[in-house]
Amino acid sequence: MNSFHLKIVTPDGICYDGNAQSVTVRAITGYLGILAGHIDITTPLGEGEARVIIDGETCTAHCSHGLLSVQGGEVTLLPAVFRWTK
């Protein structure tokens, strides 16, 4: 599976800065999945579980409010809260 650069930044600092194969987050309109090559998009985040696939392993986190941005193949999450649960 192809990968992309993912950066997750909260008001407390950087939670992740590296490659990922997939990220799924709750936007305000429902869950949104991002893979490599996704079109550019900026959307507000809702509150819910986030799933990130890193090196083939699925990691989960609580993600709450903020923004998701996909620009030029790079994905940036700017949530108010992001806590890894697995």
Predicted regions and their residues:
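Compact, glycine-rich, soluble single-domain proteins
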Residues: H5-K86
